[in-house]
Amino acid sequence: MTLQEEIQNGESRTLEYKASLPYDSQKWIKTIVAFANGAGGKFVLGVNNQREFVGLAKSVDLFEIKDNIADTIGQMCEPQIMFDITAEMVDNAQLLIVNVFPGNATPYYIKSLGKENGTFIRLGATTRNADWTALEELSNRGRHVYYDEFACPSVKVEDEDIKYLCRDFSERAERKITRKDLENLNIIIGNEKDTATNAYAIL
C-alpha cells in the first residue's frame, strides 16, 4: 500500500498526520513515543484533517525542520527512539514523513513527565496515556519477561510432574530433557528452583 493510499484510509494505530508541525512539541512527541511503544508508525506532515495533501509551506526549510524534529525526539524522549525522516512529493505537495520503528526497550516516555505520566500508547487512531496495566506490560516486554515466565506460587512443584514433563519433552525433542533444562526454560524458577511459573501451570 502506498503512502497516499494509507492516508486516504485515515489515521490508524500506525499513522498520524498534521498539516504542519505543532508549535507545542508535546502535542506531537507523545505520538512518536506511542509509536515506539507499539508497532511503530508514520507521523506525516503536510496533510490536513480532511486528508487533503496541502503540503508544507514553501517558506519551510526542510533541512531545518528535519533537524528540529530529530533534536526534539532526542532531547525529550527516553530511552533513545529509532526513527528516520524522509521527504516525499504527493500530488505536488511536499510531505515530511517521520518513520518511527517499534522499540525493544519499552517503555518509551517523555522525560519531563516521567515514566508514569509520560508513557503513551496508541489505541486505534488516538494517542493515550498508558495506564498501570499497559505500563507494566511494556516494562515486562522491555525486560523480555513474558506471561508464561511469571511466578505462579499457588501451584506446587511436584517431583512426579517434573518427571512427566521431562519424559514428555524428551519424546518431543528426541533427546533427554532434564530438570536443569526446565530451569533454563524458566518453567520452574526461584533461588532454589522450586517455584512454578505460569508455563508450568499451563503444561
Show which residues each predicted segment covers:
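Conserved N-terminal catalytic/coupling substructures associated with nucleotide/phosphate chemistry
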Residues: 1-203
